[in-house]
Amino acid sequence: MIPSAGRHRMGAAGRAAHGVLALLALGANAASLFIGATESSTIPEGAGWTRLWAAGWQNLVNQPLFFTFMSNFLVGITALLLALRPSGRGAVFGAVRLSGLVCLVITGVVFNVLLRDDTLLPLFTAVLDAVQHVITPILAPLLWLLFGPRGQVTGRRVLASALIPVAWLVVTLVRGALVDWYPYVILDVPTLGYAGIAVYVGAILGLYFVLAGLFWWVDNRLVRRVRVAAAA
C-alpha cells in the first residue's frame, strides 16, 4: 500500500527536535516579555513616530505587536503541538504552520538585511536577538524539511496562510495611526508615508508568496518521492 500524506508519521527524533524548537521560540518570546516589563522602549534614530512605552505593562503588552514575536509564536505553538501529537492535524493547523514558517524566514531575512545595525547589545539581549532572528529562522524550515509532516501544503493553504501576516499589517498600521508608534522603520508612516511603506510591504508580501510557493513545491516533490519509493 502506498502511504498517503495524512499517514506520514513523525518519529521520536522529529518530535524531540520540534520540542527543542518550541522551547527556543516560546522561551525567546517569554524573554521578550520580560524585557518589555523591565525596560522602556526606544525610538530608532530618524524615526518619525514619537510614542515611547514605559517599562512595565505598557511595554510588555506591546511586545506581541512585533512581527518577530508573532512569527516565533506561530512556529513555537505549532512545533509544540507536533512534539505532543504529530498526527491528525487538519487544514487550519497546516495553514497556521505554513504561515509561521514563512513569516519566520522573512523575519530572518528582513531583519538581518534591512534592520540590523552595529549597536552593541547587552549579553542577554544579544542571545535573545540571535535566537529570534538567526537560530529559529534557520531551524524551523530545516526541521520541516527533515521531518515533515508531508502533504500539508496546498494552494488553498498558501492563500489562507497569508491572511495572518496581512491581518498583522492592518492592525499594526491602524494602531500606529492611533497611538503614534510603529514596530519597524520600514513601516514608519510619519516619515515615509503610506506610498513609501507600500514599496516595502509589496516586496515583503511578494517574498511571502515566493517562499510559500517554494514550500508547496518542495512538499509536493517529497510526497511524490515517498509514494514512488513505496510503490517500488
Feature annotation, model-predicted:
Residues 3-21:
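N-terminal membrane topogenic signal
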Residues 9-14, 65, 179-215:
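Membrane-interface transmembrane-helix boundary segments in multi-pass integral membrane proteins
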Residues 23-46:
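Alpha-helical transmembrane segments of multi-pass membrane proteins
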Residues 41-60:
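Perimembrane loop-to-helix junctions flanking transmembrane segments
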Residues 54-73:
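Interfacial helix-start motif at the membrane-water boundary
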Residues 67-70, 125-138, 202:
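Membrane-interface loop-to-helix entry segments
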Residues 88-103, 154-162:
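Interfacial segments of alpha-helical transmembrane regions
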Residues 93-95, 119-132, 156-157, 187-191, ...:
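Non-cytosolic membrane-interface motifs at loop->transmembrane helix junctions
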